[in-house]
Amino acid sequence: MAKFLSQDQINEYKECFSLYDKQQRGKIKATDLLVSMRCLGASPTPGEVQRHLQTHGIDKNGELDFSTFLTIMHMQIKQEDPKKEILLAMLMADKEKKGYIMASELRSKLMKLGEKLTHKEVDDLFKEAGIEPNGQVKYDTFIQRITIPVRDY
């Protein structure tokens, strides 16, 4: 696992893992996996956590060691690639493969599909990404602008 994660990541994961290893036995409860993963910035759904546990043969009332925790974190982070997800969604909407989508069409999709956004949330997103309400939205520019990491103050 060390070849996939930096030493800093491993140290951060170990620190969080230790907080949930209440009996200092090198194990955490499976029921603590979701919250510990979210504390580390991952965004698993309860279903994804259940699948991770099943993959490793761990019952929902069982425990997992740090090595298994590292593997699960690596797999979760690897599958959470927002740029790739956004690009795939935009490509599905672009039937003619033009490389862009009209802002009005993007607004409609954001308000009707998946985790539906409100009109104001779409307005805020467009403002943040510098999109004109009636303009064209180029995939690469849009993805780059909305996936910029939040500055740490």
Swiss-Prot record:
Record-given protein name: Calmodulin-like protein 4
SMART domains tied to this protein: EFh
Keyword Nucleotidyltransferase tagged: no
Listed Pfam families: EF-hand_7 (PF13499)
Family label: Belongs to the calmodulin family.
Keyword Repeat assigned: yes
GO cellular component: microvillus
Subunit structure: Interacts with MYO7B; the interaction mediates the association of CALML4 with the IMAC/intermicrovillar adhesion complex. Interacts with MYO7A.
GO terms (BP aspect): brush border assembly
Residue ranges of domain EF-hand in the record: 8-43, 44-79, 81-116, 117-152
Organism ancestry: Eukaryota, Metazoa, Chordata, Craniata, Vertebrata
Job of this protein: As part of the intermicrovillar adhesion complex/IMAC plays a role in epithelial brush border differentiation, controlling microvilli organization and length. Acts as a light chain for MYO7B and is required for efficient targeting of the IMAC to the tips of border brush microvilli.
